[in-house]
Amino acid sequence: MIELVNLTKWFPTPGGRHYVFRNLNFSFPDRVSIGLMGRNGAGKSTLMRLIGGLDTPDEGEVRTNNSISWPVGLSSGLQGSLTARDNVRFVCRLYGATGEAMQEKIRFVQEFAEIGKFFDMPLKTYSSGMRGRISFGLSMAFSFDYYLIDEGMATGDPIFRKKAQAVFKERTQDANLILVSHNTRDIQDLCDMV
């Protein structure tokens, strides 16, 4: 379970504090995949960053004993001067994957992303779609109790989207999804609750 306890997040503006959340309390139960929908600026992505530990609340806390992914598809954490292979190696070291486990994850991302020779070129030479494929594949290469997906289904062409959705469905057999999407079809196909 993930519990949000009195979660408060604000950002400074010229007119004072803009509160995204104020004393938000909510529980994401285990074994349930949840879809989050809302208008632009409602705080969905901010919530995902807080749950994933990429940002800290101004007050309150996120409580869990479960493993939680970073927001799937987030490519801003990748190093542009490194190749995709080197970025995968780096993340593997952070998560304790070495030896054959590391090689397995590298193969998974390389095969999943389908970017050919670019896999061994610096990410700064990639299109945004190619970076998204690497980031998405890297996120799926690791096992988590909860996967955070912030508009993750928007990555790539229809064939790649179908492939991504198949991996999501496979992951939900052993893990939970918290999915932010404007696509009601993705929410219906992948989530138990909205």
Sequence positions of predicted segments:
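A short, flexible loop at the N-terminus of ABC-type nucleotide-binding domains that lies
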Residues: 1-4, 9-30, 35, 58
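ABC-family P-loop ATPase nucleotide-binding domains
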Residues: 10-15, 67, 72-166
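ABC ATPase nucleotide-binding domain signature region
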Residues: 30-35, 39-93
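Conserved H-loop
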Residues: 73, 182-190
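Conserved helical "switch/dimer-interface" subregion of ABC/ABC-like ATPase nucleotide-binding domains
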Residues: 163-171, 186
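Conserved catalytic loops of ABC-family nucleotide-binding domains
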Residues: 170-179
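Short, glycine/charged-rich "phosphate-handling" switch motifs in NTP-dependent
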Residues: 193
